[in-house]
């Protein structure tokens, strides 16, 4: 399991997570050029990203989503409330509420969090005997 914070703060949040053969982003509040550059610094091509997990829909967590979808088309995981309040047309997405079992031997569950947004979630990623909580 590999974890790397690509950006954190009011100007944008984006985290890279690699589990087995799968490569994920948690949030994408940075523009495509910045995110691509940061991914390449850790030897990851943007097109290798399998999915993006959205914690909430504040701009500093989703600003780069539209362009990243256009360029790479990863699957987007978000709640129904997030999707309903997101002003983007997303075709490759999955709605979840509590547990996401989307990749072999990887269990992903969500934690409902309090924040001033229609919905906010943390994630727990479990693989083999390792786990990572992103809250």
What are the residue ranges of the model-derived segments?
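Metallo-beta-lactamase
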Residues: 78-129
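Sterically constrained small-residue positions within well-ordered secondary structures
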Residues: 8, 67, 114-116
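Structured catalytic core of nucleotide-sugar glycosyltransferases
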Residues: 6, 11-14, 57-58, 63, ...
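A generic structural signal for short beta-strands and their flanking turns/coil linkers
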Residues: 13, 22, 48-50, 72, ...
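Active-site metal-binding motif and surrounding structural segment of the metallo-beta-lactamase
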Residues: 32-78
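Conserved beta-strand hairpin/beta-sheet module of binuclear metal-dependent hydrolase folds
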Residues: 1-41, 121-135
């Amino acid at each position: 399991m590999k974890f790397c914070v690509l950006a954190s703060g009011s100007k944008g949040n984006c985290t890279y997570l690699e589990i087995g053969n799968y490569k994920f982003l948690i949030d994408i509040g940075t523009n495509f050029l910045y995110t691509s550059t940061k991914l390449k610094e850790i030897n990851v091509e943007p097109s290798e990203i399998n999915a993006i997990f959205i914690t909430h829909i504040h701009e500093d967590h989703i600003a780069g989503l539209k362009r990243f979808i256009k360029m790479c088309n990863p699957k987007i995981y978000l709640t129904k409330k997030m999707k309903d309040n997101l002003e983007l047309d997303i075709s490759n997405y999955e709605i979840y509420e509590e547990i996401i079992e989307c990749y072999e031997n990887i269990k992903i569950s969500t934690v409902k969090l309090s924040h001033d947004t229609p919905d906010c979630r943390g994630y727990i990623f479990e693989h083999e005997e390792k786990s990572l909580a992103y809250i």
